[in-house]
């Protein structure tokens, strides 16, 4: 478990970024607080006829740049502090990608594994009824997150439409929906696809001709880990030499086939014991001699204890918060190029934005168009951050914060909310 209070960490990161830029004291004070916090009580009738009461949150952190955007988490240990921190990080993520959004996040304290599908539907609809007054396609646009999925988004969108008595434009009230009701092509692969573009550009700035034959190790084999393995091997010719899940990892210096490993994981519950590969631990995977390391699982896996042993030349943070602040310093001193999480994994929110644009306009794009537009967005964001890091001689995470906070600050100045 993470020991520190998540929102305290978010505020410290903001204060650190402020050292590298010109920002007024009042603006910094403003940015340390969410603009709106909503806490709701949701009564849900259970299948046995009893009623259970759940607590839900929606935090709209900052809307200077546009409607707030962010996922809805269902977690038994959800806290308001976590939701506030994640809403702050969404604010910086949408800003670094230059999307016309602010940041938001939602959560319900619930163990979804203990609910039937009917109970989940009633909870989803109850949550929308409770927060209806503070969301709209032009005010706050939720999306799936931990333990929520396209089906839950579909129920939520349907409930919103039922209350609003509106049809098509209300598709844009929520993203991450099934394709049949306004979802976007390319959403499933979006996080990994976006990360692949940043890895490609990182290789260029390191002077590599291309990625063909280069090696990558991926910690985590969920949606993002699997798609990243598939894309890096099939589209870029990289060798995926190691992957892992929560039970352990596998290594094969000749490379692993992404689809075969996924099939094995589905049949056996883990990637472990995959034929032709050697079993390794998650800790060993991180310290392999590879060109690219992609932590795509949980937070705080590269710490001051193991940062010195990292041998990769590029660390692509596909997961949220996989590297601690102390480890950041060590990797920077070692000359390792880090692609910080809220740049590296921003493909997801960017394609969510594309979904919203398609909903609002009623014009839908091909998969090729989605990928091409994502490529342009990710590449521009990468160089915005990389050039700032070079110019100020700071590491990539600090640079990403500087780029993002500067954009939010500028919007606040232009609106007259704060002064220079």
From Swiss-Prot:
Family to which this protein belongs: Belongs to the Glu/Leu/Phe/Val dehydrogenases family.
Catalytic activity: L-glutamate + NAD(+) + H2O = 2-oxoglutarate + NH4(+) + NADH + H(+); L-glutamate + NADP(+) + H2O = 2-oxoglutarate + NH4(+) + NADPH + H(+)
Active site: 105
Ranges in coiled-coil conformation: none
Binding residue positions for NAD(+): 220-226
Protein name per UniProt: Glutamate dehydrogenase
SUPFAM superfamilies attached to this UniProt entry: Aminoacid dehydrogenase-like, N-terminal domain (SSF53223), NAD(P)-binding Rossmann-fold domains (SSF51735)
Organism of origin: Pyrococcus abyssi (strain GE5 / Orsay)
EC number: 1.4.1.3
SMART domains tied to this protein: ELFV_dehydrog
GO BP field: glutamate catabolic process
Self-association state and partner proteins as the record states: Homohexamer.
GO molecular function term, any single one: glutamate dehydrogenase (NADP+) activity
Pfam families: ELFV_dehydrog, ELFV_dehydrog_N
Location of the protein in the cell: Cytoplasm
CC terms in the record's Gene Ontology section: cytoplasm
Domain of life assignment: Archaea
PROSITE patterns hit by this protein: GLFV_DEHYDROGENASE
UniProt keyword terms in alphabetical order: Cytoplasm, NAD, NADP, Oxidoreductase
